[in-house]
Regions:
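TPR-repeat structural position
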Residues: 22, 26-29, 69, 73, ...
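A short, Lys/Arg-rich alpha-helix, primarily the initiator
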Residues: 92-122
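Amphipathic alpha-helical segments of tetratricopeptide repeats
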Residues: 1, 30-44, 80-88, 199-210, ...
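Short alpha-helical DNA-recognition segment
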Residues: 121-141
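Amphipathic alpha-helical repeat scaffolds of TPR domains
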Residues: 2-19, 53-64, 176-185, 214-230, ...
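Structural motif corresponding to the intra-repeat A-B loop/turn of tetratricopeptide repeats
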Residues: 19-23, 66, 122, 192, ...
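Structural signature of alpha-solenoid helical repeat scaffolds
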Residues: 44-47, 68-71, 103, 173-174, ...
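DNA major-groove recognition helix of helix-turn-helix/homeodomain DNA-binding modules
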Residues: 150-169
Length: 398
């Protein structure tokens, strides 16, 4: 689907532009409508906005051509109107010509720096890290960045630092692509509060993991803790303590380390969420400290999934604490990056946060209502019924 989402929506729209809708026969219209609907489903499955405007326009045109003027076509028209207004507001005039690596949330770091930082984090000596397979002198040169280690050398050093499998991982290390798809589905089910489905998928994951890879076991335990928290089966204070035990450093050291792996950032995000639910806003680590490793505009896109998630959680927490201006600034930045990267993972939450802040201040503008309407349309597109209800109730109050 990642390959499809980069190519399929754009390719379909370009073909339609070349052929021309007016020149298509009824059978061609039906075929291309199916392609457009499939392309839209790929965007929904991957939470992307790449070419969503022309896709929606074509679906509306094809349905009108076929005489399908029902409620279904109105849904597409409302979605298109909301997206166009949002893109216009943030100056996103045209679709990205193509996706460069940083738009696909491709994050890289120098393995030398990761090894050096982890050595400091764990307190292991150079001699212990070298073991009986490397010379201490060579390891020291690697840590200082004088030489680049081979894959095998990197693997051995990272194994000793508790990061076995990290060179192959994207959160987890699975035995095949099915494991990564199952993890994505489990996370989606949790987001949509489909807890029984999430538990079933997490059980399936256990059979797809390499159990001797430590990060896999950490991710499984994290998912179980997170699920218990969302189901109100455990106190937030207990969740905070259990999450800290999964990290290789203390909460007090947040901001000290730059190169964290994905599951560690996921754990920290849930930690922030817990503190917010406990209303311990003063204990939440400073936003600038949490994002100190994001040094420029490009790195915001390179680490888009992490950056958008942090912005969502901090915007919500600061808003709940009554720091509306700070919340607005963070939410606005998150929305901008989501739109520039044509993503919609956290977009509806960030949009609603801006509108909610305005409501709490008692000065809701038409622009705030438009933001919430767009949040509603995105939630509707992604079939997030609970969030749809939340956004609808807010709009009805205004």
């Amino acid at each position: 689907k990642w390959i499809l989402v980069c190519i399929y929506p754009k390719a379909i729209c370009e073909m339609i532009d070349i052929i021309g809708i007016d020149k298509m026969g009824i059978m061609e219209v039906k075929d291309m409508l199916v392609h457009c609907e499939n392309a839209l489903n790929v965007l929904i499955d991957t939470s992307r906005l790449h070419y969503i405007r022309p896709i929606l326009r074509n679906i509306i045109s094809f349905k009108s051509r076929l005489g399908n003027n029902d409620d279904n076509i109105n849904d597409y028209e409302e979605m298109l109107e909301a997206i166009e207004k949002l893109f216009d507001k943030f100056g996103h005039e045209r679709e990205l010509f193509e996706w460069y690596p940083y738009y696909v949330d491709c994050e890289f770091c120098c393995v030398n720096e990761l090894i050096a930082e982890r050595r400091c984090m764990t307190g292991i000596s150079i001699e212990e890290l070298a073991g009986d397979t490397q010379s201490s002198r060579n390891v020291q040169r690697i840590i200082k960045g004088y030489v680049s280690p081979s894959y095998n050398t990197s693997k051995k050093l990272l194994d000793r630092l508790g990061l076995k499998g990290v060179l192959r991982s994207d959160v987890i290390v699975g035995s095949g692509v099915e494991a990564y798809e199952t993890l994505d589905k489990a996370l989606d089910c949790i987001a949509m509060s489909k807890f029984e489905d999430a538990e079933r998928l997490i059980s399936q994951l256990r059979t797809m993991f390499y159990s001797n890879v430590e990060i896999n076991n950490i991710v499984l335990e994290y998912l179980e803790i997170w699920l218990q928290m969302l189901k109100d089966e455990v106190e937030f204070s207990e969740v905070v303590n259990r999450l800290e035990s999964l990290l290789p450093f203390k909460y007090s050291e947040i901001g000290k380390y730059k190169y964290l792996v994905k599951h560690e950032r996921m754990i920290l995000s849930t930690y922030i969420e817990c503190l917010g639910k406990m209303e311990k806003y003063e204990a939440i680590p400073d936003y600038d400290k949490m994002t100190s490793w994001i040094t420029n505009e490009l790195s915001k896109k390179q680490f888009a999934s992490i950056f958008e998630d942090l912005n969502m959680r901090y915007a919500n927490s600061y808003g709940n604490a009554g720091h509306y201006e700070k919340s607005d600034r963070i939410a606005e930045e998150g929305i901008r990056i989501e739109i520039e990267c044509e993503r919609m993972h956290c977009l509806n939450t960030l949009l609603y946060c801006r509108a909610w802040n305005a409501g709490e201040r008692g000065n809701v503008s038409e622009n705030d209502k438009e933001l919430c309407r767009c949040a509603y349309e995105i939630a509707k597109l992604k079939k997030q019924n609970i969030r749809m209800g939340l956004y609808r109730r807010w709009l009805e109050k205004q």
